[in-house]
Amino acid sequence: MKNIILSAVLGFLPATAFAGGHADFAGHGTGIYSDRKTIEATAGTHSMVTTNDVWIYDNPPEGFPAAQKAICTYFQVIATGQQQPSGGSGTCQAVDPDGDISLWNGVAQSDGTLAFSVTTGTGKWTALIGAKFLGKTRHSFGGASVYDFSPVN
């Protein structure tokens, strides 16, 4: 159960890649685990997963890439005796094919989705700072996930 929930969290970060009222920035992505650490404590479990992702945009506006790579790190906490996480967060960093940088932060939601926003960027990404997205894992399997994301503003 913890792996499924963590995979769900992992699939949500790229949702922040585009927003600011731009419904065209919906898309999907894949995340492959590159590192995973778990800390067991008396009160619960803390997990950290780093993934190498590819984000593919359905209909990017002119000047934006159709796809880009990202490195994401996700954290979650599950209290002892619980099946669902009590919380989680994630951060992604990406450099697009043109060399522009973007950073995203997200928080796990109670419905299993991940709410993300663009926190900063350079070049074309500066116009999207503050844009919000929602992501949901479509498939999770053996250290990888496939997810969908769409803007919420």
Segments predicted by a language model, with ranges:
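N-terminal signal peptide c-region/cleavage motif recognized by signal peptidases
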Residues: P14-T16
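Positively charged n-region of N-terminal signal peptides that target proteins for export
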Residues: M1-I4
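Sec-dependent N-terminal signal peptides
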Residues: S7-A8
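Beta-strand-enriched cores of mature, soluble protein domains
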Residues: G20-N153
